[in-house]
């Protein structure tokens, strides 16, 4: 019996440490099957609803391809194409979708919405991103880290997340570290540290593990001897100009650049980025943003560092597919047989 059958994935703490690592192991196996053209379709006749209140590239494509690879069908419900929470309550929408579909993915603005969907739909619900958590991204990150260091335990791996950690990425990184024992440093000004209650809870969970979690403003302390530096965009499209200005002023000295890599004292340090990245000026939007705020060579990461690490970064992005596929298979099948 698969103990993840019919389980939701709203946040990583929905799983135990063993369950999380089993998902990573399954993702490795599914990735190998796909690479070897030996995909076994385990989800035939399954129907999946993809609710996107926020637009997406990687999350949507990963869910769709994962479902198609496994023989499932999907319905994409994009921004403005449902009555969710407007003409119809979230509860009522959840109840009807739960009768029509075997599982529901939600990507949107409010974590409370996905909690209501999960409570009322009676089918597995998966979080593609909310303002609180981004669990599917962290599953891909853990798979990427494991692929680079297959022989090392997570507690033997040091990762510094540099930039804005007061968001879904900071929260999910904390949860991931607390479950697998990753040695995690969140390197940011205090205004950009994660919520205190989440940090305190995850720190408490680490007591019986060999890893560690710290928050620090000190870049030298935070990145010294790390195996990975991880960053993300400092601001999102749609946030006000006031938010952009304040955030960029706070984080301008936390750019991931060649100097920061030297500070790690590790010539083999790897860089992760969950994308999209403001690293070059090849689009009008990014070009205007960089010019407005006085950046000549990328914002949160320089183009030089991005290009040198692009193989890992795009592998990390591809791993969204394989880990999401593992989540779908785990939650929609009573027994997993290859």
From Swiss-Prot:
Its EC number is 2.1.3.3. GO terms for biological process: arginine biosynthetic process via ornithine; citrulline biosynthetic process; L-arginine biosynthetic process. Pathway: Amino-acid biosynthesis; L-arginine biosynthesis; L-arginine from L-ornithine and carbamoyl phosphate: step 1/3. Coiled coil: none annotated. One of its GO terms (cellular component) is cytoplasm. It is found in: Cytoplasm. It catalyses: carbamoyl phosphate + L-ornithine = L-citrulline + phosphate + H(+). GO terms for molecular function: amino acid binding; ornithine carbamoyltransferase activity. Carbamoyl phosphate binds at residues 56-59, 107, 134-137, 274-275, 320. InterPro entries: Asp/Orn_carbamoyltranf_P-bd, Asp/Orn_carbamoylTrfase, Asp/Orn_carbamoylTrfase_sf, Asp_carbamoyltransf_Asp/Orn-bd, Orn/put_carbamltrans, OTCase_ArgI. The keyword Nucleotide-binding does not apply. It comes from the Bacteria. Keywords: Amino-acid biosynthesis, Arginine biosynthesis, Cytoplasm, Transferase. It is an enzyme of class 2 (transferase). Gene3D superfamilies: Aspartate/ornithine carbamoyltransferase (3.40.50.1370). L-ornithine binds at residues 168, 232, 236-237. Reversibly catalyzes the transfer of the carbamoyl group from carbamoyl phosphate (CP) to the N(epsilon) atom of ornithine (ORN) to produce L-citrulline. NCBIfam families: orni_carb_tr. Belongs to the aspartate/ornithine carbamoyltransferase superfamily. OTCase family. This is Ornithine carbamoyltransferase. It comes from Buchnera aphidicola subsp. Acyrthosiphon pisum (strain APS). The gene is argI.
């Amino acid at each position: 019996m698969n103990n993840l059958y019919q389980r939701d994935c709203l946040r990583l703490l929905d799983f135990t440490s063993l369950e999380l690592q089993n998902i990573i192991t399954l993702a490795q196996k599914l990735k190998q099957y796909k690479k070897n053209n030996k995909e076994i379709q385990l989800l035939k006749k399954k129907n999946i609803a993809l609710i996107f209140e926020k637009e997406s590239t990687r999350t949507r494509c990963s869910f769709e391809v994962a479902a198609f690879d496994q023989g499932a069908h999907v319905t994409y419900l994009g921004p403005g194409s449902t009555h969710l929470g407007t003409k119809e309550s979230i509860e009522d929408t959840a109840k009807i979708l739960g009768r029509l579909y075997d599982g529901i993915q939600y990507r949107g603005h409010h974590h409370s919405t996905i909690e209501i969907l999960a409570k009322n739909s009676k089918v597995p619900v998966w979080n593609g991103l909310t303002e609180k958590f981004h669990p599917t991204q962290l599953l891909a990150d853990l798979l990427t880290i494991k692929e680079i260091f297959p022989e090392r335990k997570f507690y033997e791996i040091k990762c510094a997340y540099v930039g804005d950690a007061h968001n879904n990425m900071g929260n999910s990184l904390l949860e991931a570290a607390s479950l697998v024992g990753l040695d995690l440093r969140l390197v940011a000004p205090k205004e950009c540290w994660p919520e205190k209650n989440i940090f305190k809870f995850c720190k408490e969970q680490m007591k019986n593990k060999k890893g560690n979690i710290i928050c620090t403003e000190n870049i030298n302390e935070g990145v010294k001897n790390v195996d990975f530096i991880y960053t993300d965009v400092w601001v999102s499209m749609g946030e006000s100009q006031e938010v952009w200005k304040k955030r960029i002023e706070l984080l301008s000295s936390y750019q991931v650049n060649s100097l920061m890599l030297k500070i790690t004292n590790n010539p083999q340090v790897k860089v992760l980025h969950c994308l999209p990245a403001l690293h070059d000026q090849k689009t009008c939007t990014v070009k205007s943003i960089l010019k407005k705020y006085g950046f000549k060579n990328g914002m949160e990461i320089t183009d030089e560092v991005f290009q040198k690490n692009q193989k890992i970064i795009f592998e990390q992005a591809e791993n969204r597919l394989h880990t999401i596929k593992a989540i779908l298979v785990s939650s929609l099948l009573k027994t997993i047989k290859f």
